[in-house]
Amino acid sequence: MTVPPTATHQPWPGVIAAYRDRLPVGDDWTPVTLLEGGTPLIAATNLSKQTGCTIHLKVEGLNPTGSFKDRGMTMAVTDALAHGQRAVLCASTGNTSASAAAYAARAGITCAVLIPQGKIAMGKLAQAVMHGAKIIQIDGNFDDCLELARKMAADFPTISLVNSVNPVRIEGQKTAAFEIVDVLGTAPDVHALPVGNAGNITAYWKGYTEYHQLGLIDKLPRMLGTQAAGAAPLVLGEPVSHPETIATAIRIGSPASWTSAVEAQQQSKGRFLAASDEEILAAYHLVARVEGVFVEPASAASIAGLLKAIDDGWVARGSTVVCTVTGNGLKDPDTALKDMPSVSPVPVDPVAVVEKLGLA
């Protein structure tokens, strides 16, 4: 007896296989993949009711290493392997190192990570350690680490720099815009996302414009990039020497993709704005409690920025908005645990438990 299937399952092939004809990949290249991409676009029904907009969340924390970085890393490591390079190198506050280490392990090559002094989310660093990365802490901030990494890659051609200054990273990350259009059938009115090193806003804009040039969409979104107030060089129009924010993934004072990010903002008639740590944390708790989506603090910057832009009228009620939430909340559990309530035991008694829950 043959049992009919209860669901149709179409295995996702990874971003290179899914969009190979739109990516700079050689015919004889073998993708280094963990089946990244294909992440859900979730209708944020409660946020939509609260704001009067139609909001969708692009949940990039469901990529293999828990962040959007995997889209670009499959391209970067595939490219490095195809060109015979023996190691990949990155400067990282966490997510890039986790992704680079995983894909390097998959490819069988060395991964080296330069991390700054100061706050690093341990959940992210643990991933890089588990994948066998060689980690070196630098006496400086992220921007110092990236400058050093650039010099090393320039001086040693067997090493590939896989930060978002590597253009093939942007190529991989643009596929998220393709996926959004493929699901919605059009571009959103506004696309909101966090901005740190600014590669992602660059990549999304590239993806949307390529689909527009191909005639697959007839409009382009306005790009809304939110930075943490303590690390907001694009908002201020000048580098920040000592960036500081609870959102460690966007604690960057001089974005590597500054020029292309400004182009994306200007060409889309978009906007950069700053959200305080308090506003970011409020959005972090809000999206977890009303939508069931647990994100790391930096991811919540996109929602914090959107709420501010709705309040000041820049985003009109009734607009269709996509918010990219870039990383999983398990990347930075310490932030969530700061609000852990004190726990006191109750008797082994159902009535006592129901009363404790306030359900009596």
UniProtKB/Swiss-Prot annotation:
Function: Catalyzes the gamma-elimination of phosphate from L-phosphohomoserine and the beta-addition of water to produce L-threonine.
Positions carrying N6-(pyridoxal phosphate)lysine: 69
E.C. no: 4.2.3.1
Keyword tRNA-binding: no
Isoglutamyl lysine isopeptide (Lys-Gln) (interchain with Q-Cter in protein Pup), cross-linked positions: 151
Keyword Ribonucleoprotein: no
Temperature section of the record: Loses less than 10% of the initial activity during a 10 minutes incubation at 65 degrees Celsius. At 80 degrees Celsius, 90% of the activity is lost over the same time period.
Full protein name: Threonine synthase
Species annotation: Mycobacterium tuberculosis (strain ATCC 25618 / H37Rv)
GO biological process entries: cysteine biosynthetic process; threonine biosynthetic process
